[in-house]
Amino acid sequence: MVYFKTLLDGNSSLGEILAHRYETWSSRMVIEAVLIPLVHCPLLWKILDIVIFTSLPVLLCGLLGVTGRGRWFVTGLVLLYPFADMASAGWIATTTNYLWPLWGVLVIGMVLKQLRCGRKVPVWEAAAAFLACAYAGSQEQAAVLLLLLLGMEVLHYISEKRMKQPLLYALCGIDIISLIYIFSCPGNAIRSAQEMAGRMPEFADFTFAEKLYMGLANVE
């Protein structure tokens, strides 16, 4: 987090910093466009993070249709998460890179549920879904998760012959653009090579199945 705090201390603008990060380290420009200013305003981050974390069980209950005492169960499950893990790379950096994209995926899930139920999505909710998709899609794992989620929704409406879903297609477009951006980012390739050389040089020789297993397994 100290690193991000020093980025705006020089003469470079936020746009120049993000462009440099894109070329040399990361494609998470939407996330970092939020992260870097928030590092200089920790009070605002605290307010936003509290709102996001406390709304997680609300979103989960809404998605799963949980009511009554079941809401307390879902809330308890959320509270079981060892939140100290969010300090691994600094509180602001870790939450904005991992917790907030998860929240964005849940927001999109709620909007998709409304579409499934045939309800009209208000303009402000559609706008929130677009912002959530752009933000969550900036994080690699969340972008892939959204692709699967949105893809399944498209197949569902195709099977039901309900093809007029402009909001869904717009979300798909945002996520696909995000994925193209991720895969074409030179900084991601540079970071991957540096991390591999410094942490696990033999990783390049692993099979796809071995890499997939390592990605899914707990390697603590």
Functional labels for PLM-detected ranges:
Residues 1-44, 52, 92, 133, ...:
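Transmembrane catalytic cores of multi-pass membrane glycosyltransferases
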Residues 24, 28, 71, 75-113:
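Membrane-interface micro-motifs in multi-pass membrane enzymes
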Residues 47-72, 107:
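Transmembrane-helix motifs of polytopic, lipid-linked glycan transferases
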Residues 49, 53, 97-108, 145-153:
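Hydrophobic core segments of transmembrane alpha-helices in multi-pass, intramembrane catalytic enzymes
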Residues 59-67, 81-84, 108-118, 151-163:
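Structural signal for the C-terminal ends of transmembrane alpha-helices
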Residues 71-78, 125-132, 169-175:
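Central hydrophobic cores of alpha-helical transmembrane segments
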Residues 114-134, 163-169:
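Short hydrophobic alpha-helices at membrane interfaces in multi-pass membrane enzymes
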